[in-house]
Every structure is written in structure tokens, then in C-alpha cells.
């Protein structure tokens, strides 16, 4: 990290401003080679200067604002300079090219955040939260990411890891003196404390994962039960074509929706039936594929029509999938829907009318509640583990800690107990970045954009 990197920090295309970011030991000197302030003088940290960006041949590229954030009071803990110019593609690109010609290197994806991590500005879980903030699709997901960026998860994990390291140091010292033996009370308490923390973090992980990553929800049923109308009602826009002709939908249609704070991909499908129409049959096959890849199925029936063999076939088709049974076309809310047919994985039954909007809010909330395991998170609940990598590391830590408890209770060899505790400590260290290799870091930071 002895060089200075530069990249465009704003999205491509036209906008109000475009930002070129530099970080490294030569950020100030490079910036002054390409930026001519209207009022001469040295750059001051966290102050904005007005001037012009100058190209390699002395030509004016654009008028701009320059902001210096001097080390260590910057995101990367290095000297950081941001040049804000007009947001057209050409001024931004020419400003970046001028910085590169003046001695900067084009940054790799996520390299600014990587430098912040390597310089101790943030831990690895906070680095990942930075990307989660950028990619958040709902306010709940954003709140979880912001809380993780604030360091709550790192504090919890470090506390659990410290509780492990103290007895581990004690046990390691005894390996060379096995005749002294382990005092169980010295070790059991910290192990129990660490395991309690890990289990508490895991308890909210399933909800956190859904709120961060979303879920795929497929609408299935025989033709003309109102699947496309339900999709439009849940989206609150006319996205799918709706006609009274069975088989109108010939392909899958995917749309993103925010249902009670849960990011959901809603998938409308062709009515599933045997057809001699080759185009419709392709649609039926795609519907089956969408069902196989869904987290939840909305099995739609027409409450105004008798139950049919095709409806029975849909019960079989969804038997291995968590399912909400939806009675559509309940246009009169005072008339109860038919009894729900038996289904081995039915999570709920909802009556609604896509035509008049009755029960649509209830359906949306039921979808969200089902995906979150039966309950919506409390208002303001942001301390939820939401990253699959973190959940996997916590699960490994819990396994090692339970094994350590069994090893201790059995009075087994000291080195076996030390191995269990070392495994738990290393698993927790993977979350904060204290025990990770370069390959994992490369994988994580490659997901970032170049300017972050």
C-alpha cells in the first residue's frame, strides 16, 4: 500500500456531479498537479477548495471542487482527496485520466475499503456492511447494515473470542505440565459465556438473512385463477397482462417488491396444465422450474369455481415447498372462502380479491411473516446477523464450543480441549478478519465497485 490509487466514485452516466477519489501517500501532490485552485495556498484537511482540473497539456478540463481528508482522519487512514466535477461522462473520465497520468494507479474493486480494513479503520464485518448499505433494498435491510457498520457485531464477536482466548492461554500453559490438571471451574464459565453469545447471535440469523438477501416467491396455480392479477395487486402497478382467456401468461415474469419490509422477488408463472400448444407447454415447464427454485409458493385457487383435477395436481406439485394457500376472487368479503384443502407444507391460508383489493395487505404481511419464520422483527430491531459467511462461522464456533464442553466434562486430554477452543477462536476471528487469508479477502473485496 505504498502507492496512490484513484478511481471514479460515482455511478456511470450523467448526473449533477462526478467524484474522482484518490488515496495514498502521494494523493495531495498528485491532486495539486492536476488541480489549479482559484486562490493559491496549501491544502487544509476537511476544507473545500474551488478551482479547475488541468489536463496533461495544460488545458482546462472542468471547474471543480477539491476536498482533502488528511491521514489519519479519513476513511482509509491515508491522505484522501476527492475532486468533484460536473457529472458528465467525459469530464469525469478525463479527470481520472489526468490523475493517472500524474502518477496514480487505477484502484482495484473495493481497494479503498480494503485499505480501510488493512489500516485498522474498520474490521472485516464492517467492510462487508459497507457493501450491504449500498445494496440495501428495504429500510429494514439498510438499518441492519448501518448497525453492523457501526460495529455492534464486531463488539459481540470480540467479546466472545476474548472469553475463549483467556482459558485457551491457561490450557496451553498446562500442556507442558499435564500432571497439574485443569481446574474445570476456570474453563467452564468462559466457554459457557462464549457459547451463549454465539447462540444468541445465531438465533436472529435466519431473519437477518431474509431481510438482507430477500426471497423468491412464486405464484402458481392452474390457468385463469388470477395469478397475474395478484402479482399486479401486490406490486400496486399493472405489470402483468391480464385477460379472461386461460393461458394468457406464457412465460415467467419476475418483479422486485417490498412486502412489509422484506425484499421479495415475485414470480408470475404460466398456468400449470397439460397442453398441446408447444409455446404454452414451454411456459408450464418454466413455471415448474421457478417453483423448484422458490423459497415460498403462493398456491392460488379460484374461490368462485369448483375444485378441479388441475387444482388437485397443484397440491401435489407444491407438496415439497413451503406454501401459502391463496383463495383469490373472494370479491365479497362477507362470504367466507371454501375450506382449505389439505397440504403437507401449508404455512397459512389467505382469502383475497385481486380485483377489489380485499385481503391484499393481509397477504403481503403473511408472506413477510412466513419468510421470517412466523414473526416480524420488533420495530427498530437491527442487531441481526445477516451475512451467510458470518452465520457459517458462528455455526462452526458453536460446534467447537459444544465439543469443548464435552471434552472438559469427559476429562479428556488437555491438547484436545485446546484444539476445540482454538477452532472456536479462529472461526470467530474469520468474522472480524483476525484469522483470514488473502484468498478470502480477495473474494470479499472483489464484490465491490472500483471506486469504493
Curated annotation (Swiss-Prot):
Q: Localized where?
A: Cytoplasm
Matches recorded under Pfam families: MMR_HSR1, MnmE_helical, TrmE_N
Question: What is the stated purpose of this protein?
Answer: Exhibits a very high intrinsic GTPase hydrolysis rate. Involved in the addition of a carboxymethylaminomethyl (cmnm) group at the wobble position (U34) of certain tRNAs, forming tRNA-cmnm(5)s(2)U34.
Q: Where does (6S)-5-formyl-5,6,7,8-tetrahydrofolate bind?
A: 21, 82, 121, 452
User: Per the annotation, which location comes first and is thus the protein's main one?
Assistant: cytoplasm
Any GO MF annotation of the entry:
GTPase activity
Task: Provide the binding site for Mg(2+).
Answer: 228, 249
| Annotated family | Belongs to the TRAFAC class TrmE-Era-EngA-EngB-Septin-like GTPase superfamily. TrmE GTPase family.
Gene symbol of the encoding locus = mnmE
How the cofactor is bound: the record states:
Binds 1 potassium ion per subunit.
Entry's Gene Ontology BP terms: tRNA methylation; tRNA wobble uridine modification
Q: Does the keyword Cytoplasm feature in the UniProt annotation?
A: yes
Q: What is its EC number?
A: 3.6.-.-
Oligomeric form and interacting partners: Homodimer. Heterotetramer of two MnmE and two MnmG subunits.
Give the main EC class: hydrolase
- CDD domains in the record: trmE, TrmE_N
Quick one: which residues bind K(+)?
Answer: 224, 243, 245, 248
- Might you report a single GO cellular component term? cytoplasm
Name by which UniProt lists this protein: tRNA modification GTPase MnmE
| Species name | Chloroflexus aurantiacus (strain ATCC 29366 / DSM 635 / J-10-fl)
